[in-house]
């Protein structure tokens, strides 16, 4: 799931037809977990309230483009054509944005585990 953190909210892209998007429209209580493997395995989790935003009441395209730049473009201006093509395709779908306002934060830093990995590979070698 693509996400963007702006310092106050998480922004998540979806479509009206996806079940999870429709469920958020009925019940705005959400949890989000973001995992990372490098440079150190860990994750953050947030519980909060989500709001479904969609055109024409909200211009979703500037933030949708930032999401595409993050994941398709990977921050490299040389990938601008790929980002443009991806956003053009997104605009053919019934897109929405989810604005998640965190209320509770959790974090786990896996460096506390021997070998700095808390995965099956480490467990099998113990």
Functional labels for PLM-detected ranges:
Residues 1-16, 22, 30-36, 43-46:
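Short beta-strand segments
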Residues 16-18, 27-31, 76-86:
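Short acidic (Asp/Glu) patches
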Residues 18-19, 58:
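A generic structural signal for alpha-helix starts
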Residues 19, 39, 106:
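Flexible, glycine-rich phosphate/dinucleotide-binding loops
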Residues 25-26, 91:
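Alpha-helix boundary recognition
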Residues 26-27, 100:
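A short, compositionally biased
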Residues 42-126:
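Charged, gly/pro-rich active-site loop segments
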């Amino acid at each position: 799931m693509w996400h963007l953190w702006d310092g106050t909210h998480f922004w998540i892209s979806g479509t009206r037809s996806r079940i999870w998007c429709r469920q958020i429209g009925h019940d705005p209580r959400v949890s989000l977990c973001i995992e990372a493997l490098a440079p150190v395995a860990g994750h953050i989790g947030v519980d909060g309230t989500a709001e479904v935003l969609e055109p024409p009441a909200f211009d979703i395209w500037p933030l949708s483009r930032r999401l595409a730049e993050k994941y398709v473009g990977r921050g490299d201006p040389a990938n601008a054509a790929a980002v443009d093509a991806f956003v053009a395709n997104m605009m053919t779908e019934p897109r929405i944005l989810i604005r998640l306002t965190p209320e509770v934060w959790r974090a786990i830093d896996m460096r506390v585990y021997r070998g700095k990995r808390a995965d099956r590979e480490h467990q099998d070698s113990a």
